[in-house]
A protein has these predicted regions:
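Short, small-residue-biased leader/transition segments that mark boundaries at the very start
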Residues: 1-3
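Flexible, glycine/charged-enriched surface loops at secondary-structure junctions
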Residues: 6-7
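Short beta-strand segments
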Residues: 10-14, 78-80, 128-129, 175-176
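Internal gly/pro-rich beta-alpha loop/helix module
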Residues: 11-16, 20-25
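Conserved mixed alpha/beta catalytic, RNA-binding, or beta-rich assembly cores of soluble enzyme
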Residues: 23-158
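Glycine-rich phosphate/pyrophosphate-binding loops
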Residues: 162-184
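C-terminal beta-strand edge segments of enzyme domains
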Residues: 186-188
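Acidic, PIN/NYN-like endoribonuclease modules and their adjacent C-terminal/linker elements
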Residues: 190-201
Length: 201
C-alpha cells in the first residue's frame, strides 16, 4: 500500500500472449484516486490484505481473458467485511465451501484456482474474507442500490457490486461476459482490464 502523498506507480503492459511490452504508464496515486475515493487509506479496507486483492485480481483477469471451457463468463467477487456482506446476501445453492479448513479454501492457495474458475460458471457472487478465505459461492447480493449511478449498459452484477460496496466496507471485482474486469469501492467503479483493448488500465 502507498505510504505518502508522493507515491507513484509505474505500470508496464502489452497485448496478452504477444510477448511484447508496449505501454508504460506512471500514475500519481494521490492525484488519481483521492478525488474519487477519498483519502488513500480508504482505498484498501481495514482487514483486507493487499496479497488477497492482488490474487483475486489475477484470477478475475484470467477469467476475463480465457473464460471457462471455451466460453465467456461473468463472475463477481466481494472481498472484505464478509459478515456484513453475508447479512445482505442469500444463497442460491448449497455453499460449496462449507466444512473445509480455512487453508484449503484460501485464494492464496494455488490449488484453489481451478475450483474458483469452475464455480464461476454458476450464478451468484463469491464472498471472500479480507485474508483470502472464501466464505461462499453462489450468493445473491441483496444490498439496496439507492443513490447509485452507473453508466448505461451495465448489468445486475455491476449494480449489485456498487450497492454492496456502498453499504459495506468491502471491495468488489466484477468480470463481465464481454471480458471486462471492473473494481468497485464505496459504490464507485474503475475499469481494470478490458479484453477488447487487450490490456489493463
Amino acid at each position: 500500500m502507498c505510504s505518502s502523498d508522493l507515491d507513484r506507480v509505474c505500470c508496464v503492459g502489452g497485448i496478452p500472449q504477444s510477448g511484447q511490452l508496449d505501454t508504460v504508464l506512471v500514475v500519481d496515486v494521490d492525484e488519481e484516486f483521492e478525488s474519487v475515493i477519498g483519502h488513500e487509506e480508504d482505498m484498501l479496507p481495514n482487514g483486507v490484505s493487499a496479497e488477497a486483492l492482488e490474487r483475486l485480481t489475477a484470477i478475475a483477469t484470467d477469467l476475463a481473458l480465457t473464460g471457462r471451457e471455451g466460453k465467456s463468463i461473468g463472475a463477481m467477487f466481494i472481498l472484505g467485511d464478509h459478515e456484513e456482506v453475508y447479512k445482505r446476501s442469500k444463497q442460491l445453492i448449497l455453499n460449496p465451501f462449507h466444512g473445509y479448513q480455512d487453508e484449503d479454501r484460501n485464494i492464496l492457495n494455488p490449488f484453489m484456482d481451478e475450483t474458483i474458475k469452475e464455480l464461476s460458471l454458476i450464478d451468484g457472487a463469491f464472498i471472500v474474507r479480507g485474508n483470502g478465505v472464501v466464505e461462499t459461492a453462489g450468493s445473491l447480493i441483496q444490498a439496496k442500490a439507492d443513490n447509485i449511478v452507473l453508466p448505461g449498459g451495465l448489468g445486475t452484477r455491476h449494480a449489485a457490486a456498487a450497492a454492496i460496496t456502498h453499504a459495506t466496507n468491502s471491495i468488489a471485482l466484477v468480470v463481465s461476459s464481454s471480458g471486462q474486469v471492473t473494481y468497485f469501492r464505496k459504490g464507485r467503479m474503475f475499469t481494470l482490464f478490458e479484453k477488447s483493448a487487450g490490456r489493463a488500465f
